[in-house]
A protein has these predicted regions:
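Short beta-strand and strand-turn-strand segments in soluble, beta-rich domains
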Residues: 42-44, 89-116
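Short carbohydrate-recognition loop motifs
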Residues: 13-40
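Extra-cytoplasmic beta-strand recognition segments
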Residues: 1, 29, 33-35, 44-79, ...
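Surface-exposed coil/turn segments at beta-strand junctions on protein surfaces, enriched
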Residues: 55-57, 70, 119-125, 161-163
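Short edge-strand/loop segments of extracellular domains
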Residues: 78-89
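Beta-strand-rich interaction surfaces with strong enrichment in secreted/lumenal proteins
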Residues: 47-53, 112-121
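Extracellular beta-strand ligand-recognition surfaces/modules
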Residues: 127-168
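Extracellular carbohydrate-recognition regions
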Residues: 1-10
Length: 168
């Protein structure tokens, strides 16, 4: 089940399905934030796919193609638990599957959940390949440097994220 989330102000970001006219990549989702003053926040406007079939722990590969009008355009991907409980502070928990080979101590400036990539060539389809370890989760999208309370833990066999998550 694909979905669009757009919490930006009207006219800032548009997300729509379009036919590209390209025989190899005939259909695409287009995200246009040319009305924005800066890049779109990770939680404000995105295209996602919800997964409710149930996953098994292991290494998964997410592959897609992206194209941008300008070289250097950032693309981000993460896999998050759909429904979260509130913690003791009254805030919603955030549970993400971890990028494969992430080490919070060795990579203190990197997110363990979010894969960040920059499109190198303008107007050219670029293959993006990301590996996720569904056997581990992190409790925040931020880096350990910006969130010293960042926790990496093994995924429980009956964890809710294995039954209902979405990829962005």
């Amino acid at each position: 089940e694909w979905f669009i989330m757009n919490n930006e102000a009207d006219g800032v970001t548009t997300i729509a399905w379009e036919q590209t006219g390209d025989a190899k990549y005939p259909n695409a989702m287009k995200i246009d934030n040319s009305g924005a003053e800066k890049n779109t926040s990770w939680y404000k406007a995105f295209l996602g796919q919800r997964i409710t079939d149930g996953l098994e722990k292991g290494i998964y590969v997410l592959t897609f193609y992206a194209k941008a009008k300008e070289a250097g355009t950032p693309v981000s991907v993460y896999i998050k638990q759909t429904n979260e409980e509130k913690n003791d502070n009254g805030k919603l928990n955030t549970t993400f599957f971890m990028r494969r080979d992430y080490d919070a101590d060795a990579q203190p400036n990197a997110s363990g959940a979010q894969y960040n990539f920059k499109i190198k060539d303008a107007d050219k389809w670029t293959k993006v390949v990301v590996y996720y370890d569904m056997g581990q989760v992190v409790n925040a999208i931020s880096s350990k440097k910006s969130n010293p309370a960042l926790e990496v833990s093994d995924t429980d066999d009956d964890a809710a994220i294995l039954k209902d998550c979405y990829t962005i």
